[in-house]
Amino acid sequence: MYSSSNSFLGGVNNARPGQPPFMQQPPYSQLPQGQQQIPQQTGFQPQPTGYGSQSASHLQPQPTGFPTGQLQPQFTGFPGAAPPQQQQQFGGYQAPAQQPQLTGYPPQSQPPSLQVPSTTGLPTRLAPRTSSEIANSFSDGAGVAPPPPPKSSGSKIPNIRLSFITAQDQAKFEQLFKSAVGDSQTMDGEKAKELLLRSRLPGSELSKIWVLSDTTKSGQLFFPEFALAMYLCNLRITGRELPSTLPDKIKNEVSGMVDIISFGVPDTEPQGAARTNVPSFDAPLLENKSAPPAPQHPKPQQPSNAQFLSQLAAQPTGFGPQATGLQPNQPSLLGANATLAPQTTGFPGQSQQQYLHSQPTGLMTNPQATGYNGPRPPLPPMPTGFGSNLSSMQTGGLAAQPTGIPGQWGFVNAPSSGLPNIEALKQQLMPQPGREGGFTTAGLSGNASIPWAITKEEKKIYDDLFRAWDGLHKGFIGGDTAIEIMGQSGLDRKDLERIWTLADPNNRGRLNMDEFAVAMHLIYRKLNGYPVPNRLPPELIPPSTRNLNDSIGAVKSLLSQDAESRKASGAFLQPQKTGVSYLKEHSFRGGARSPGFGRKDATLFKNNDEAAAGYRSSARRRVGNDARPSSPPTSQASEEELSVEQLKKKIRETQIMLDAVDFKDENRAEEDEVLDRRDRLEAESLMDRTRRVQDDIDTHPNAVFRKLDNGAERRSLRRQLQAFEDQVPQIASEVRRIEREIADAKLELFRLKDAKAHPNSAANIVGTGPGGTVTEADRIKARARARMQARAAELAGRPVPASVDDDGAAVRRLEAESASIRADREKNEAMTRDVEESVREFTRSLEDSLKEEGETSTREHERRRWEDALGVEDVIRDFIYDLQRGSRTAHIRKEEESRASAQEQRLRHEEPSPGVSRLSPAPSAGSAGSLPGSTHEDRVAAARERAQRRIAERMAAAGLKPHTDTSETLLQRQEREKREREERLRRAEEEDAKREQERQRRLAEEQRSTSDTPAKPVGKKPPPAPPSRRGRTDSAGQAEVKKAAEETITAEQAAREQAIREEQQAQEEETNRLEMEAQKREEELLKEKEAQEARLRALEEQVRQGKIRKQEEKRRKEEAERLAKEKEAALAAQRAEIERAKERERQLQLELERLDEESSSDDEGPVNITPEDSTPTQSQLLPTVTPAAPVSAPESEQAGSPEDTSSQAPPVDFKLETESKNPYFKITHQATDTQVVSSPPVPQPSFTSPKADVHSTNPFHRLAKQETSKPAFTGSAPLERKSRARPEADDDWSAAGSEFDSSDDDDDERPGGGSAKQLASILFGTMAPPRPLSAMDDKSPSKSSTPVQDSPVASLPVPESNGSLSAPAAPPPPPPPPPAAVPSYDPSVAPPPPPAPPMAPPAPPPGPPPPPGPPPPPAPPAASGPPTPAGAPDRSALLASIQKGKGLRKVQTNDRSTSSIAGRVLD
């Protein structure tokens, strides 16, 4: 219940207005009232006597004197003495009156009446009582009734908004607080605990919350503290941590509101007791140290404070000091002259029923009922009596007593000087927007004790207010402003008039700083309940006014005294001739007896008229408007005449002084020059370092990413963002409109479906009402129509139609569907709103990111100064412009170099391709990837450009308009970019030239303006050494020099100011012009961008239309090609049959000859066996053979052949080729390969030197190179048509061809072993390759190797070619992997996919690849009969066949069918 054992001690003095401190009751003696002792305090805290350490219904007895037993010792008198026996007190509580208390020794009998008390200890000196004590003694009689208690008023909570909680929460907390405390202003600890426990938080958390909330440490909560506790509970409930200490903002708000509530409590002191300005607690200042402290006179308890005391911790009322006296006949431990007499305590003349009863002193055996009957907290012992050297005083454990005003209660957080209200007053009176509204004094008024004098803190606050309102620093505040300021205090006009009169004693109509402070202090006092004085107190008179008034008064008194003395002495009539001077007696420093006597002041001044002869005016020596030089002071020595020697001596001394001054000036000028030189060197070195750093920045690789014009880019992005944001509402409205249309369409669709499902339903009724609604008339008509239909059906014998559904079913179905549609629409609408909200949030985030971060006025000024060269000197401006020009030049140069290097690299990769294709017909050399040193990216880029060029050519041949971008060649693009760079350079040079012209113009204007002035401006040059003044003593010359120098300086300043103004104007104009130009450029760029986007859209549309037309033409061409291929296939089949018959006949003849010649067959046997065995094996194991290519690669590297790179690159290129889905692209590659191979057959042997021979030994390696070279070449239709005309050459086969065929037959014979069946199969199997279809891909030596491995596996390339939509040139594309998978895929070759119809027709006539019966369609393209046996297995046979050239001729001859097919596809 009690916060501590001493808490109620401190609370008594404040919680009980009008009650004196505990244990301080005035004594009563037989002496008259005038001889009573003055109330004195010893400086120690008041401490009660006689309470035990335990709390019970009755207090335990506590003796005073020596400690015996369990009670604490309390000894009387001097600290060194102690009574022989103990006294015992019994205390109990009985409210509101106190029972009598008996003190003393047992033998004494105490009369019921009051006895005369005597002070213990040494005899005290009596002192007269104060007037307040005398006045209070009359009102302490028993007949005086206590004043009526003040009316109870409910708890008043200031209308102040707490920032850390919401307005709704604050209103709820106010209601809860009022319901809990009733009329009180605070909530006790138990009630607060009960409320806080409802939060179900652990006790440790609630303990922390209580410690943070109880800011006053009083064990009770004011409303702001209660609201803070609720706020902290909410923080902990929501999972957030409690702060270790309250934030300053929250702490200030809570303490300020607590102070307002505390000061707003009405004063409970009796109305009749008038208070003085001097607080009663200043008594220690008047204390007489030699006299013992006199207890203060008690004041009656005011029962009206019970309502407040009920809300606070129970605190006992104070007793008067119990002076325990010794009997006179008992030996005193204090000495013979220190006998103590018994004394009574209590009020004299009061009845037993009112307040304290008389307490006779008596024996120890008599019980002494004291104080309370209720439980009391333990109190520490306190020695009574007086001693000058008290050292055993126990003061530990006492809490600090808060200050307050009698009549108030509770703990008040009031500062030692001033009150928090003054801060509120300052905030109220500070100039702020909207102050013209109504004024309120909420939180300003109070009843604080405010002295007349102004403290330093208050003066500082008033001075801050004055400076805040004195914006122009006039030093005073006018009447209008003062009315506005003082009107905000809310005082009456009469009070403000009186305050103004007191503050402005001189009636000037304005207030200076001191007078304003006086006015504010008077307002502050008035707000705290003090009346406005009629005259200004001396403490409030400003020091300046007081000193001035004192000085004026002193002068007046001096004048009056002087006049009286002159009148008395007769000097008043003729003061000049009296010869007596009274000036020394009239000094302000106190006259002749003052310590400063002898020093002259204004009272001792006397004008010397005789010295006027030595005065020489300098007015006639003034030149121009120069200021008048000070006249040489007249000295007393000028009256004396100097001798010639003295004059010469003075001249010499003056000359020496002038020489010294000249020397100093020269040294100073030299030092300045040295400093200037050093500064210039440092500036130049700094500029050089800056240039180097700028060059490093410009030449850094990442300098391209540096944003030079970040602001312009931000502005353009903000404009784009705004444009997009403006489109959002339009798009949202379109979406909503479409949603409505969809909903209407769904509803209409449902009506139609419902009408179909329920023909006779009422939903089929056509509404004629507004908006198509069905009316009752429409339903009646529908029912009548239905009855007519039913009757007609009965008459006609038809079945009666189903009964019409009731209207409710149709309506219900329609409503259900409408509800579902509406739900979908609402869902979509919610999604649309979510999208809009997300777009808005995204837009806000983008706007925040695009804002000028950190852009302040200072930063903008610095940027304009150091980037735009505004407001700097000419040298710095030129330096900044040079840096900017160098940066722009470096940026443009770097762009040109990067583009030039990129173009050179592109050209270097593009130029070798056509050269190689022209030099070598070999497919391996026709690709950019075959060049030594070329990378994969270069090869891909070159192939892409060639493909684009070929596509453009094909589109042009097909009559399609090519894309504008593709039509622009590399040279044209380079030319265009070069022109653009030149244009940018030209614009940059023009801007630089304009800036230079502007700068030159400003310099010329400055020179012109300075030339007009009489003196030449010094500029930046160091000042020259001052001229020597030796031999020049004329003061007129000095004046002229000085005047000329000042005129020069004035002219320089004027010229410089004019130049600065002109420069600023020019800079502003230049800045505006640049901004306008930048804006125009941005607008032009935006327009160009829009136009470019429009052109791109148009071109994309053209390309799309072109593609569509191209696809249509392609389909038509494919159809025509298919028909042509079918015809050609039939013709080819017929020609093949004829040729097969011829070959069969020729082979039979050769076989007969071989049978006769065994030796020749034996020699040829091994050759035949090897190809026959190896060919199928290789065809099946083609993937495993492919790794053998690197084996030949090192050989080629050692030989230095350029095909080394191509041997490694083919797989990658082949992958690109196989992934391509463009049939034209593949056909072009195949046609190009055939063209390249067939065009130069004759130079082949010469080109394939030993290197080529060595390289061609590996057929798979050649195959890979062939496939690699294919993607890079494109064939043309004319060559294919030419190849289609070659079939007739097959009929005219030469002897060389027969020899080649015979060699093939020999090769095929060996596997047969001489059997007729095997021979026939070999003969028929070898007939397929000679077909014209097979010779297409075998024109080049590299091709000859490919057919070799393809002859047995003729079907392998065909499926691959069909699958990839390539023409007869399909065999090359499949590298190692395809062959292995082809045999399984071979059966499907007969029905090839639609993209490869050309290959399908040739397939049926021949048959399967390896078997002789049905030569597969792919066999012709993939494998040529003659080269097959000679090339794949046996390298020597392959080389022999290549060197002969006859096989090549035969292959070229058989290219007709294949080329014709390809030509048709391409056309």
Curated annotation (Swiss-Prot):
Instruction: Report the residue ranges that make up the EH domain in this protein.
Output: 169-257, 458-547
Q: What keywords were assigned to this record?
A: Actin-binding, Cell membrane, Coiled coil, Cytoplasm, Cytoskeleton, Endocytosis, Endosome, Membrane, Repeat
* Biased composition range(s): Basic and acidic residues: 892-912, 935-953, 973-1009, 1054-1087, 1101-1129, 1136-1153, 1279-1288
Q: Which residues form the WH2 domain?
A: 1434-1451
On assembly, the entry states: Component of the PAN1 actin cytoskeleton-regulatory complex.
Which regions form coiled coils? 634-758, 965-1162
Q: Locate the EF-hand domain: which residues?
A: 201-236, 491-526
Q: What is the protein name for this chain?
A: Actin cytoskeleton-regulatory complex protein pan1
Pfam families assigned to the protein according to its UniProt record, in alphabetical order:
DUF1720, EH, WH2
Compartments in which it is found: Cell membrane; Endosome membrane; Cytoplasm, Cytoskeleton, Actin patch
Q: Hey, what's the signal peptide range on this chain?
A: none
The UniProt regions of compositional bias labelled Acidic residues, in chain numbering, are 1154-1165
Gene3D superfamilies noted in UniProt: EF-hand (1.10.238.10)
Q: Which family does it belong to?
A: Belongs to the PAN1 family.
Q: Which gene encodes it?
A: pan1
Which residue intervals make up region (Disordered)? 1-157, 266-376, 613-643, 822-864, 888-1087, 1101-1467
Q: Does the keyword Hydrolase apply?
A: no
**Composition bias type Pro residues, residue spans:** 292-301, 1369-1381, 1389-1430
Q: Which GO terms describe its cellular component?
A: actin cortical patch; endosome membrane; plasma membrane
Report the source organism: Aspergillus fumigatus (strain CBS 144.89 / FGSC A1163 / CEA10)
Q: Where is the composition biased (Low complexity)?
A: 25-48, 77-101, 919-934, 1183-1197
The protein's topology relative to the membrane is:
Peripheral membrane protein
Presence of keyword Cell membrane = yes
